[in-house]
Amino acid sequence: MKLKRLMAALTFVAAGVGAASAVAAIDPALPEYQKASGVSGNLSSVGSDTLANLMTMWAEEYKRLYPNVNIQIQAAGSSTAPPALTEGTANLGPMSRKMKDVELQAFEQKYGYKPTAVPVAVDALAIFVHKDNPIKGLTMQQVDAIFSATRLCGSKQDVKTWGDLGLTGDWAKKPVQLFGRNSVSGTYGYFKEEALCKGDFRPNVNEQPGSASVVQSVSQSLNGIGYSGIGYKTASVKTVALAKKEGAAFVEDNEQNALNGTYPLSRFLYVYVNKAPNKPLDPLEAQFLKLVLSKTGQQVVVKDGYIPLPAKVAEKAIKELGL
């Protein structure tokens, strides 16, 4: 289910959050984390680069509470999570996209049931440009025409210069330099599906190994444009407001707009786990996820620049996990 439909169903309102809010608000109805006893052992996480900082920060908090826990984190990209979970080489599979059917089938073929997707944060996938770029906003059709070779979203012409996007003066003839993620990345897959209408990327997109690399590359290129999770924003870049179609209002990538579904590139971030039906999770995994879905865990989400879960989403996940 897409984020906007779920949020509409929950009728969640981000109380007290203005349109220009830079700091996400914690839902006061989120549960407090209660420390358990006897939690120790080894926990491994393999998956998303987008979630790398979050997983590390959650791991640090978890180890503070449980010093006898050792946590290993590998963050090469979302596509590394499904095989690691299926092969049993990881307990946790952080992903910035949902698993594909073929990934679910491989897991189900081995275990007889599907892995459980746990929503852990909300992300606004942002379009970044250099801080000195005067562009005010882009339509989703323009975004497709910038990054795609196929233009399946409906744009009638390619975008090769900033003049093609309406900039004038010295900017008009400047070529657009593209930065993005590689195909192992869940962000790559999500952007391909949602922003390119399942089309193909241009061959001249400079593929970067991580989200931070995309933002850093854009910050060093006056002509640059790239896509990455909002949590990687720095002072050297700015994000571009997006409109769903020509003539529609440009929408900023803030908490309120991500949660109410008006921002076009809102998504859940997930941690997948191997939970057998009618069997409790191992205490190591259970307490980690319980921490992540608590006020304490969601404060970490805010600290890392992402958007915390509404309490109703966290409650649903807690119930499904039997925590």
Swiss-Prot record:
Pfam families: PBP_like_2 (PF12849). Gene3D superfamilies: Periplasmic binding protein-like II. Disruption phenotype: Decreased phosphate transport. In PAO1, decreased ability to adhere to and disrupt a layer of human epithelial cells. Hyper-swarming in the presence and absence of phosphate; hyper-swarming is usually seen during phosphate-depleted growth. Increased induction of alkaline phosphatase in the presence and absence of phosphate. Double phoB-pstS deletions act like phoB deletions. GO terms for cellular component: extracellular region; periplasmic space. Keywords: Cell adhesion, Periplasm, Phosphate transport, Secreted, Signal, Transport, Virulence. Induction: By phosphate starvation (at protein level). Different strains have widely differing amounts of protein that can be sheared from the cell surface, in order of decreasing quantities MDR25 >> MDR1 > PAO1 > MDR13. Arsenate, pyrophosphate and polyphosphates up to 15 residues long inhibit phosphate binding, while organic phosphates do not. One of its GO terms (molecular function) is phosphate ion binding. Can be used to remove inorganic phosphate from water, which could be used to control growth of microorganisms. It comes from the Bacteria. The keyword Ion transport does not apply. InterPro entries: PBP_domain (IPR024370), Phos-bd (IPR011862), Phosphate_ABC_transporter (IPR050811). Binds 1 inorganic phosphate per subunit with a KD of 0.34 uM. Required for phosphate transport. In strain PAO1 implicated in host cell adhesion; in some virulent strains (e.g. MDR25 which expresses very high levels of this protein) antibody fragments against this protein decrease host cell adhesion and increase transepithelial resistance of human epithelial cell monolayers. Its ability to bind phosphate may allow it to acquire phosphate from its host. This is Phosphate-binding protein PstS. It comes from Pseudomonas aeruginosa (strain ATCC 15692 / DSM 22644 / CIP 104116 / JCM 14847 / LMG 12228 / 1C / PRS 101 / PAO1). The gene is pstS.
